[in-house]
């Protein structure tokens, strides 16, 4: 892969996105997110050799929201291994990210770890045996370690905004608690959940944190194995099939990469063996995924030939 080509493609995509009028709608149900500039756009791509191509607002921190679920899943699998799958499934939901419908049909077991109910169950596992502050500290330190940046922090204003308005998440958690899926007090689990979703990172930091998923579980910056190659492959598989809620099929069809979105407008995408990619554009589509983020990634994979399904 030519670094000059990558630099040019990333710059071209950023210029193209700046001209787009169809930007989607900024999330309004979390008051703090509603204040974000809808014209923001950032893109960062880190190649296998460590070269970084970045453009636009790639160094502006944003609320990663559900992208944090990739990293909490990684932590939970490290703690519990396959025992995790007793409390959460691995199937696409086909429903909105905060839907309670399937929980009713499936006796409190969430479909996958990337919908809200599934991520709450994963958070509960990480919390077990710890105080909420300890569990949250572990998650934050893990993110800082992966990104190689100790300045990464939680946006307390966003976390408090989510706590004040997170009634559906409270309903999901209480419903799972009634089936014994959650071990800890609901308010503790939700507190940790809201706070790790409120971690703020830039595209550059997020792409750095995701590099282990592009390189068989190894962090190329340190040479350390974060997870086994098998586990990295399986996390990527879940990102491909479940990472964009009920828009996961559309994302796979158009982009052709494992990816995880967040309602803050970010997307972390993985080109296995090639690159870790983070894009941010706050305007969302009807499924709650970044509209221009998806468009930008589609352009990137086409021009670089990175779709896992072929050029």
Swiss-Prot record:
Pfam family, one: Glutaminase
InterPro entries, per database record: Beta-lactam/transpept-like (IPR012338), Glutaminase (IPR015868)
The protein, known as: Glutaminase
Name of the encoding gene: glsA
Broadest EC class assigned to this enzyme: hydrolase
Gene Ontology biological process terms from the UniProt entry: glutamate biosynthetic process; glutamine catabolic process
EC number: 3.5.1.2
PANTHER family: GLUTAMINASE (PTHR12544:SF29)
Gene3D superfamilies: DD-peptidase/beta-lactamase superfamily
Chain sites annotated for binding substrate: 66, 116, 162, 169, 193, 245, 263
Tagged with keyword Hydrolase: yes
Subunit structure as annotated in this protein's UniProt entry: Homotetramer.
Catalysed transformations (reactions): L-glutamine + H2O = L-glutamate + NH4(+)
Organism, as annotated: Rhodopseudomonas palustris (strain ATCC BAA-98 / CGA009)
GO molecular function, one term: glutaminase activity
NCBIfam families documented for this protein: Gln_ase, PRK00971.1-2
Protein family per UniProt: Belongs to the glutaminase family.
Keyword terms of this UniProt record: Hydrolase
Listed transmembrane segments: none
């Amino acid at each position: 892969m030519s670094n000059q080509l990558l630099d040019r493609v990333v710059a071209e995509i950023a210029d193209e996105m700046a001209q787009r009028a169809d930007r989607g709608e900024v999330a309004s149900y979390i008051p703090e997110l509603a204040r974000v500039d809808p014209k923001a756009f950032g893109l960062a791509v880190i190649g296998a050799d460590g070269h970084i191509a970045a453009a636009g607002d790639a160094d502006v921190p944003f609320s990663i929201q559900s992208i944090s679920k990739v990293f909490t899943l990684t932590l939970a699998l490290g703690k519990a291994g396959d025992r995790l799958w007793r409390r959460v499934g691995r199937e696409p939901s086909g429903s909105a990210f905060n839907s309670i419908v399937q929980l009713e049909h499936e006796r409190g077991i969430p479909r996958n770890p990337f919908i809200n109910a599934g991520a709450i169950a994963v958070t509960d596992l990480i919390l077990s045996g710890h105080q909420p502050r300890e569990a949250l500290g572990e998650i934050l330190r893990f993110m800082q370690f992966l990104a190689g940046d100790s300045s990464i922090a939680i946006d307390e204003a966003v976390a408090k905004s989510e706590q004040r308005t997170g009634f559906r998440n409270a309903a999901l958690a209480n419903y799972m608690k009634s089936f014994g899926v959650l071990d800890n007090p609901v308010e503790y689990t939700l507190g940790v959940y809201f706070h790790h979703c409120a971690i703020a990172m830039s595209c550059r930091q997020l792409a750095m944190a995701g590099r282990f998923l592009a390189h068989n579980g190894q962090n190329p910056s340190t040479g350390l194995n974060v997870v086994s190659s098998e586990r990295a492959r399986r996390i990527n598989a879940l990102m491909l099939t479940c990472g964009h809620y009920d828009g996961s099929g559309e994302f796979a069809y158009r982009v052709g990469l494992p990816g995880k979105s967040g309602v803050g407008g970010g997307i972390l995408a993985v080109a296995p063996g090639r690159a870790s990619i983070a894009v941010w554009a706050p305007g969302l589509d009807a499924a709650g995924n970044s509209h221009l983020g998806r468009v930008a990634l589609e352009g990137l994979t086409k021009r670089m030939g990175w779709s896992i399904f072929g050029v």
